[in-house]
Structures are given as C-alpha cells and as structure tokens.
C-alpha cells in the first residue's frame, strides 16, 4: 500500500537534509554525547526517547541521514551510540568483558553529538543503555540506515552464514529487543545512487505509526522489524509489503549487491526477497532470539 502521509514526510525530510547540507545542523545543538539528554523536546508532546545506532559506523551517510530526519520533529529525543568504525557483518557479536567498553565523544557527519563506541553494533547498544540512559531507557532503538539491503533468511555464501544473521544492523536491533526495548532495523538498497532520503521517509513513517504504542510501552519485543527500502535507479517505490523473510531464492537474486527493479509489474510477491527486488519496501519480523542473542545476554 502507498501510505497517505508520504508526501508530507518527503517534504519534511527533504527540508531537514537540505539544512544539514548547508551546515545549519553542524553546531551540535542536539546535546552532548555521553549525557542522558539529547535531541529536541520542544513540541509540547511527550518526548519519544530514541536510541540510534548502526553497523556502518558513526560517521556513515545512512545514520547521518536518519538523525537529520529525526531532528525535524521536536518531540524526538535522540541519542546516538554507534561503532566508531565500520563493523559491517558482525551480527550480534559482543566484546567480551572485562575490560569495560570504551567510547569517545564524536559527531555524525552533520555534526550531531554521538558516542563512538570501540566495539560492535551490539556493544554500542549496551554502552548506551549502561552509560547514556541513567534514568529511563529509550522507548525504541532505530538501527540504520544500513548501506545495503538485508533481505532473506538464506545462505549468501559468506562464511556459510545467513543474510539476516550476519547483519550488524539487525544484530543491534535484536540485542535491544532481548533487553525489552522495541527495535527497528532499516537498510537501504544497493545501487549506483543510494537513496537514503527514501529510507528516512519510511523509517519516520514507521515511527509515527507506532509512536503512541511506543510511548505506552505496548510494542511487542519478541521480534524486531526488518525494513528494506529500494534505491530506485528508475521508476518509483511501488509501496510497502508486510511479508515474511524468504527461506529460498529460486530466482537467483544477488542478495548482497543486486539492484532493484522499481518498474516491475510483478504481483503477489510472497516474501521479502521477491518484494524488495521488485520495487517494494518490505517489512518483515525477525525473532529476537533467532541466533541465540537473548541466551548470550542472560
């Protein structure tokens, strides 16, 4: 389906990203990394506490685009805690303790304060919960936006692992869910031009649809939501499908580097692989303990 508030979100995101490109957001007015308060809360509504993380690293384009999009809404209270360097394909790996995790105060590419954690994506979540949320936990963890799709529960030939299992973006989200915090993992499709702006629109739309439930603590945490957004080189995103993870890939899509056909007319697409590569945003549940993430935390 095409969501009715997409145009308004596109305009808001475009404005926010344009201001960021002009340097209007580089003054770091969102707060200080390493403190419990960041982001705007001047909208008069209850603030939504959002922890943003990823696996591409705190300086990556995807997390920067997401944070700038979130800042458009003054009711979003944003804290960023992400790996200091690129930790792609680290799944739900965590640094053995002791020693304690280390982090440095840094910023996103547009200058928003962040904690750069010397560790994996799951470590970044743990660091934030233990050091940056001293009073109340976040209402939600947003992991992404990843630079490359994460679709399918099928072997991709990388150490004989499965696509959703090796994703640090998904691993961070599962870690949050295992700790009782709702989480969304978002990934932008590969292509000549990575369309993070469309990814931001879809994440913000998900956030608005779930804002009331997140504030009320009513979003289930037995699974996380895995959102994949096409980067259309031609045509337009066809809509969104709520579909399960694919368990096979009979059409031979290149799951890691394959481009998406947004001009496709294929219908009745049964899973995330078929939906995504035929131009749809796909939303799929991933069990939080799929790879024993929760068991490792207990």
Regions found by a protein language model. Give the residues of each.
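Mobile, glycine-rich extracellular loop/lid and propeptide segments
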Residues: 58, 62-70, 126, 131-133, ...
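N-terminal secretory signal peptides that target proteins for export/translocation
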Residues: 1-6
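Active-site-proximal beta-strand/loop segments in catalytic clefts of secreted hydrolases
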Residues: 53-56, 81-86, 117-120, 143-147, ...
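Ser/Thr-rich, Pro/Gly/Ala-heavy low-complexity intrinsically disordered linkers and tails
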Residues: 19-46
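Electrostatically charged, flexible surface regions
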Residues: 90, 197-298
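Active-site histidine-anchored catalytic micro-motif
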Residues: 46, 137, 143-174, 178-184, ...
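Bacterial N-terminal signal peptides
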Residues: 10-21
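A cross-family phosphate/adenosyl-ligand binding-site feature
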Residues: 46, 50, 68-130
């Amino acid at each position: 389906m095409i969501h009715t508030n997409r145009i308004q979100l596109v305009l808001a995101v475009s404005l926010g990203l344009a201001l960021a490109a002009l340097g209007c957001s580089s003054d770091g007015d969102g707060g200080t990394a390493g403190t419990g308060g960041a982001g705007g809360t001047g909208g008069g509504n209850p603030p939504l506490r959002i922890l943003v993380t990823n696996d591409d690293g705190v300086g990556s384009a995807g997390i920067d685009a997401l944070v700038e999009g979130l800042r458009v809404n003054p009711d979003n209270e944003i804290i960023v805690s992400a790996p200091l360097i690129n930790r792609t394909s680290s799944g739900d790996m965590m640094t053995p303790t002791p020693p304690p995790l280390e982090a440095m105060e840094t910023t996103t590419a547009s200058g928003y304060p962040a904690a750069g954690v010397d560790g994996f994506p799951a470590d970044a979540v743990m660091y934030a919960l233990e050091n940056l949320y001293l009073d109340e936990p976040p209402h939600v963890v947003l992991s992404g936006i990843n630079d490359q799709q994460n679709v399918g529960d099928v072997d991709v030939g990388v150490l004989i692992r499965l696509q959703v299992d090796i994703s640090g973006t998904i691993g961070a989200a599962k870690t949050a869910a295992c700790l009782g915090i709702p989480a969304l993992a978002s990934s932008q499709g590969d292509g000549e031009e990575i369309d993070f702006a469309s990814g931001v629109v879809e994440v913000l739309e998900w956030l608005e649809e779930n804002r009331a439930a997140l504030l009320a603590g009513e979003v289930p945490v037995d699974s996380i939501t895995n959102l994949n957004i096409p980067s259309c080189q031609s045509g337009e995103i066809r809509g969104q499908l709520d579909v399960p993870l694919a368990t096979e890939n009979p059409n031979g899509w290149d799951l890691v580097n394959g481009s998406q056909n947004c001009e496709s007319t294929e219908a009745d697409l049964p899973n995330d692989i078929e939906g995504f590569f035929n131009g749809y945003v796909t939303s799929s549940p991933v069990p939080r303990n799929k790879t024993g993430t929760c068991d490792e935390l207990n």
